[in-house]
Amino acid sequence: MLPIAILAGGLATRLRPITEKIPKALVGIAGKPFIVHQLDLLKRQGIEHVVLCVGYLGEMIHDLVGKGDRFDLQIEYSYDGPVLLGTGGSLKKALPLLGDSFFVLYGDSYLDCDYKKVQAAFEMNGKPALMTILRNEDRWDKSNILYQDGRIMKYDKKHLTPHMKYIDYGLSVLSKDIFTGIDKESVFDLAELYKDVVDTGRMASYEVSERFYEIGSRQGIKEISRLLEPKIMNMDGHQREERQDE
C-alpha cells in the first residue's frame, strides 16, 4: 500500500474553546482521542506508513502517537515550523518523506471506504492525481464538484452552483509531480492546487458510496461519536449504544 499523509496542522478555530489547549486530532471521541480511531482505521485498511503533517500544538500529537508502535504502523512527522503553511504548503514540505505517490487524508476525517480499490484506480488511470468523490447533493455538506460522464468537470469550494451534486470525499492519491514549481515554504490551501489540477485535466476520480464523517464541527462530533460508541448487547440479543457522558 502507498504511504498516507494526514493533514493535522490547523488551528481548528471552529471548535474553540475545545481546541484552545489541544489540537483537533486529540479531541475525545467515544472515549479516545480522534486520531486513535483514525489510525486504527488506516491499519485495518492495510496502510503501513503514515506521515503526520502537524503545526498547531503538534508536539502533543507526537507525545501521544510516537513512532506508531502501538498501532503497528510506521509514523513520521513533518512540522510546519513557526509559520503555519496551510494544507497545501504543509503537504509540499512533507514530500521528502512520502515517495513518488501517496494518499492524502484530512486530519479531521473518518473515511471508511476501500483504500485498496482507490489505489488500484489511481494506478490504472495513469493521471498524476485522483480524488474520491461522493454523490452528496448538499446532504452532508455543500457539494463542490460538477461530475459528468465519469469526469470531474469543475471543482470549486468558493463558487458553488446548483449543478454541483458531488463532493470531495476527503481522500486523494497524488503524485509528487503536481507540486513541481511550488516553493517548499509556500503557504497555500490544497484546494487551490486541486482546482488547478482539475482545470488542466490531470485529476482522475473514484466514486464511493460510504458517507464521510468529520470532527470539524460540533454536529460532526456528535455524528461520529454515535458511530464509534461501544456497543453492548440487550437482553434480547440486539445491540444498543453504550452512551458516553457528554
Q: Which role does the model predict for each range below?
A:
Residues 11, 108-109:
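Active-site metal-binding loops of divalent metal-dependent hydrolases
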